[in-house]
A protein has these predicted regions:
Chain A
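Basic, helix-initiating cap at the start of DNA-binding domains
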Residues: 1-21, 25-37, 62
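Hydrophobic alpha-helical connector segments
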Residues: 62-103
Length: 225, 225
DNA sequence: CACCGTGATGACACTGAGTATTGTCAATAC
DNA sequence: GTATTGACAATACTCAGTGTCATCACGGTG
């Protein structure tokens, strides 16, 4: 259409003004004026000034939630990696906007706080999903918490690297690497299929003393009480 | 002294009023009036309404920072666990206040956001410290990010459990368990001392097929590229 | 064509957080 | 005794966010 949606015009006006004049210096009136609507209309589309910077977070969160829920215990790991890829893909799709927002968020504490809060919402989602997946196994809550935190941290690390590099390279190989790392690290979280068919690998240095071997074994056993 | 510090009176008045009348329903004027000072005095002691709920976060953060900086690469793990214990100890010291705040934060989204932001600051601190510690090793940034996230997640999991239980039990054994778990999980993050003297443990199910063993080994190797 | 319901928008008023400025008073220094 | 400093109060201001009501465009209906 000739005139893009009001919602989109508002978001664009907001980011442009924040960029030009600074966040605190820009009033909602300014944004509404630039978008050619009234102040009240702004608040009809966005609950707050910050909201205009993160227009589609709720949608994305719902998408991730849906992807996680559309899986069984057998496909949990795939669901998690898929969900993370969805999020990253969302940033990559609109690299222009993502980069501008990244620079903006870096300069405005209020926006940084907002972003951190939304990251926490993803982490909570993953935690709940993984918690259900692991339910019944020992330390399920703890493990779910740790794995959710790691998954989200891995995503953020890759995303930040991509943003800092100016959104130039393809971030999915790094993401796969990072997620592979997380999954390998947490592989022993998976519930043993039938309790007897586990495969575990151990190697010993030929020069290792029996004491050193014992300590390694104790550490290993100590982590699964 | 007969009259406690104004700062303390303000914080107490704030939490009391938030408890009685709700957060949004309480104005800064109310808080100041209850503390027997003027509105402007409130803002002299706290930058915002939320600040009054988390009076000593900055101090605690500085303490943690100091503890981390007062360590070398050799003692990094001890420093991390110590730092986490400092934080938990701070909550336990004043269980009364911690519990009241926990209930309050659970009900007020604005406070929850604030708390999440301060958790992020701890995580950042740990990430930087661990990053320096691992500097030079492959994937140092990624590993630092993951371990910091896990350490913080472990702490929060234990803290939440303690708070939900009403602050009754001693949370340090659970913390040790959780941290032990994290450290065991990330043990292979430690840089090998001299590259040849590692001790690694591997066990195989007697019924495992050679293929299963090979897969396990490949997974193991895949996590250290 | 006149009428009517509906949904989007604007105009406006109000509350309250946070800031900045200025004034006042008391303690301490000199 | 006077000057300086610092803690607090008083006041006015900006602006985010909420709520209410009027207006206008519109599509359908009689």
């Amino acid at each position: 259409m000739a005139t893009p949606s009001i919602s989109h015009r508002l978001a664009e006006a907001a980011v442009a003004l924040f960029d030009e004049n600074g966040y605190d210096e820009t009033t909602v009136d300014d944004i509404a004026a630039r978008a050619g609507v009234s102040r009240s209309t702004f608040f009809r589309y966005y609950r707050s000034k910050e909201d205009a910077v993160f227009p589609d977070h709720d949608t994305l969160l719902a998408t991730v939630d849906a992807r996680l829920r559309a899986s069984t215990a057998d496909t949990a790991i795939v669901a998690v990696t898929d969900a993370v890829r969805i999020v990253l893909a969302h940033y990559v799709e609109d690299a222009e906007v993502s980069l501008r927002r990244y620079r903006l968020v870096g300069r405005v504490p209020a926006l940084r706080a907002r972003e951190i809060a939304s990251v926490a919402r993803y982490q909570r989602l993953f935690r709940e999903f993984i918690g259900e997946w692991l339910a019944g196994s020992p330390d399920a809550d703890l493990r779910a918490e740790l794995m959710a935190a790691s998954v989200v941290a891995a995503h953020n690390q890759v995303l930040r690297g991509w943003l800092r590099a100016g959104g130039t390279h393809d971030p999915f190989p790094p993401l796969d690497h990072a997620l592979g790392y997380v999954i390998a690290t947490f592989r022993h979280l998976e519930r043993p299929q039938d309790g007897k068919d586990q495969v575990v690998v151990a190697t010993f240095s030929r020069s290792a003393s029996p004491q050193a071997v014992m300590e390694a074994i104790q550490d290993h056993l100590g982590s699964r009480p």
